C-alpha cells in the first residue's frame, strides 16, 4: 500500500511524474491511497478502480471563527497583547516571509517567546521548533502556509491569520490546525 497525503498539492506543483515513477516500480497488485482535504480532482484520470470517501459534510463544531480588523501597523502589537493572556499559545500565519521575519524580530524585542517557521528553515531545526512549541516552551509560532498542511499539534486553541489567506483552501488548512 502506498499512501500519498496532500495529493492536491502534488498536482498543483506538477509533481505527478514522481507519483507515476513510484507506481511504476510498485508491485502490480499495489493499493494506492490519495488523500486530499480540500481539492477535488478527477481520480479516474489518475487511477483505475477508484473509490472516493467524501468527508466534506463533517462539521467541526468545536472550532469557532471570528474576525477582527486590525490596521497593518498595529498587528504586531495585537499579537503582543494576545501573548500576554494567561496560558495563551497560538499559531500565527503570514503570507510573506518578510512580514513574518519583521514580526518575529519585533515580538522578540518585546520579550515574547515567538519563533518563525518557514521554508528557509532547515528540516532539523523545524523539528526542534515544533517540539518546543508542542512542549509549551513557545508562546507564538509564526509560520507561512508551509505549516498549514500536515502537522498535528495537540491542544492548539488558537490560529491567527496575520494576513488574509490567499484562497479558501489556505484558510481551511490553517483553521484545521485547531479542533
Residue ranges and their predicted role:
Residues 1-179:
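Conserved helicase RecA-like core
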